[in-house]
Amino acid sequence: MSYWTLADLISYLRMPFLAGWGLTALGSTLLYFRQNDLIYPANVPAGSRTQVPEPTQFGIRNADSVNLQTPDGETLHAYLLRPANSSISKNCTIITFHGNAGNVGHRLPIGKILADTLGCYCFMAEYRGYGLSTGSPSEEGLAIDGQTVLDYVRNHEELKNTRIIVYGQSLGGALTVKLVQANQHVGDIAGVILENTFTSIRKLIPSVMPVAKWISVLCHQTWKSDETLAKMTKTDIPFLFLSGLKDEIVPPEMMRTLHSICPCRKSWHEFPNGHHNDTVAEPGYFDAIWAFLIHE
């Protein structure tokens, strides 16, 4: 299909990339030794490490495929999407970090809406060990990836003078929190968008894998978003929280906790019928982002 309508895009976005976090797939005895495989199921759905959809498949014409080099020698794949209509351009670049399954190509419908409808540059970053990127994922590695992406945008001739918005979904939200907290005093992050993000992996385990709740302390991939968010001291960076109230993987209470902890200027939008993977397809989702971009 060479051209997709908005209705087509929304239908595609409702396709579940992951029925449940990998933690539910194997016994609790494997939590410690196999946790990276469970937390970062880069091969779900099948073929995700080799079959990466391209922008033209979604009618996106003004886009680049980019390779970034990390300081520790990995190559990250990414897409840069440009606004289709300069007359509605918000002069901002939205850096997107996706959830723990699939690849950056699966999220191109989101990028198309951000670029074509909202008029933003959209830099869709891939993690190490996902899609066409090299390496193996880990909390430490993804933190390096996030910093590499942010530095690339900061120094990109076309993007460096735009407002930078960092937008993360689920695991990508945890990376967003870590990245923004580490870079808050540089002064070039204009906003943060978090969707269906957990407080920490250890606190999430009892929800997705009750039989393992007593050994969650063994989890070394911690992603302590609640503790990291509480360390924000530059409180003029605005945050937008987007929460699906029917999220079957990350309890909505975790998003409320993050919202409560966040010391920055913040706004909250909830979607009564939003599940973990399809909140982005709920009515009003992109309206909330549009309003955030206009007012912040």
Question: What positions do the PLM features span?
Answer:
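Active-site nucleophile loop of the alpha/beta-hydrolase fold
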Residues: Y127, I193-K203, Q221-S225, G274
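Catalytic histidine-centered segment of alpha/beta-hydrolase-like enzymes
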Residues: I249, G274-F286
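Primarily recognizes the serine-hydrolase "nucleophile elbow" in alpha/beta-hydrolase
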Residues: Y152-H156, N161-S207
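Membrane-embedded segments
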Residues: P71-Y152
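Short beta-strand/loop motif that positions the catalytic acidic residue
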Residues: M232-D236, L240-S243, D247
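An N-terminal hydrophobic leader/cap segment in hydrolases
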Residues: P16-N67
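Catalytic histidine neighborhood in serine/cysteine hydrolases
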Residues: H259-D278
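Short alpha-helix in the alpha/beta-hydrolase fold that links the catalytic acid
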Residues: I110, S225, P251-S260
